[in-house]
Amino acid sequence: MSAYYNDSPARLPVNVPNTGGALPGFDDDTVVEVWCDVDGSGARPVPQEPLPHAVRGITQTLAEYQRLAAVAAWDGTRADAVRAMAAHPFVPTLAVAEELYDDLAAANRRFLPERLLR
């Protein structure tokens, strides 16, 4: 914040859209945390090397899960939220995703819109 507010150039890790493919292998609209050159004009991602094969697949899978969860949260339904949860690599089956979602939704019912509860 200081680099931006004070127009004091710095290289910092920032969460930004992957515009221009700063991190190869991810869509331009995927939010990635990469090194950026930051000053009063904003944050400009520094081009990155592709992630190592050992972590690339799971990172792409988690990015897709996060995208699906965000879409469900903004204007989706319970079914969309369950599908998002099922896309998480630690959730083994759709039945487990439904059970997890129902438990989370029940615990957070007062914060959720009705469309995510039915």
Where are these regions (language model features)?
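Long, compositionally biased stretches enriched for glycine and/or charged residues
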Residues: 1-118
